[in-house]
Amino acid sequence: MSKLFWAMLAFISRLPVPTRWSQGLDFEEYSRGIVTFPLIGMLLGAIGGLVFVALQSWCGIPLAALFCVLTLALLTGGFHLDGLADTCDGIFSARRRERMLEIMRDSRLGTHGGLALIFVLLAKVLVISELALRGTPMLAALAMACAAGRGVAVLLMYRHRYAREEGLGNVFIGKVTGRQTCVTLGLTAILAAILMPGMHGVAALVVTLAAIFILGQLLKRTLGGQTGDTLGAAIELGELIFLLALL
């Protein structure tokens, strides 16, 4: 399990992970690593939270929130944000399914993708600022938001099909078992109960689960399945929805 954790950390983040820590792990085994996603999200969110807490007293809440969001983007190399932009470019092109998938594969940023990035990043800065002004424990909130975003993404993997013939998302989509899904969601719920005392965190997680489940069904109907881009979009939107649900 430790090898899977380090392999997944290297896969979905830009944190330096020595190759020997995940050596001997076959790429086809990566689907089992979905259960580590909430823990990896918690780690990344905690780093972003530490940046916010460290800068808050020095430059104020809005700028601290801005640098926190920037840190989270840098930690993943914009991996999930790129998926969000590509998904919006394809979906909102209002073309045929095959053409949508072609647009999503295009490396160029379109208008809809650009607008999606602006909206999500700005919304995160504003919501983080508002939560801090309301006295929310930000280190825990940010750690849990990133854990929730990655944990609920399993809903776009279990019993879904891959919309393309090949790609990185094919490692997870349709390969995750019911047991792995339950463990992933259960671990995410446990983290919510621990990090956010009371029912506030769990309630926010339930809202996030419902929203991402609906998103997955809509994407399935539109694209005929999921892709790595839609997983990235689900993670980014999951983080934002969880933070909004905490308000």
Swiss-Prot record:
**E.C. no:** 2.7.8.26
Which InterPro entries does the record match to this protein?
CobS
A single Gene Ontology CC annotation of this entry is: plasma membrane
Q: In which pathway does it act?
A: Cofactor biosynthesis; adenosylcobalamin biosynthesis; adenosylcobalamin from cob(II)yrinate a,c-diamide: step 7/7
Cofactor(s) needed for function: Mg(2+)
Q: Name one GO biological process term.
A: cobalamin biosynthetic process
Subcellular location, record wording: Cell inner membrane
Tell me the enzyme class.
transferase
Q: Main site of residence? A: membrane
What are the TM regions of this chain, as residue ranges? 34-54, 59-79, 113-133, 138-158, 171-193, 194-214
Where in the chain are disulfide-linked cysteines found?
Answer: none
Catalytic activity from the UniProt record: alpha-ribazole + adenosylcob(III)inamide-GDP = adenosylcob(III)alamin + GMP + H(+); alpha-ribazole 5'-phosphate + adenosylcob(III)inamide-GDP = adenosylcob(III)alamin 5'-phosphate + GMP + H(+)
* Protein topology in the membrane: Multi-pass membrane protein
Q: Kindly list any coiled-coil regions of this protein.
A: none
Q: Name one GO molecular function term.
A: cobalamin 5'-phosphate synthase activity
Keywords, A to Z? Cell inner membrane, Cell membrane, Cobalamin biosynthesis, Magnesium, Membrane, Transferase, Transmembrane, Transmembrane helix
* Function in brief: Joins adenosylcobinamide-GDP and alpha-ribazole to generate adenosylcobalamin (Ado-cobalamin). Also synthesizes adenosylcobalamin 5'-phosphate from adenosylcobinamide-GDP and alpha-ribazole 5'-phosphate.
This chain belongs to the protein called: Adenosylcobinamide-GDP ribazoletransferase
This chain's source organism reads Citrobacter koseri (strain ATCC BAA-895 / CDC 4225-83 / SGSC4696)
Q: What is the lineage of its organism?
A: Bacteria, Pseudomonadati, Pseudomonadota, Gammaproteobacteria, Enterobacterales
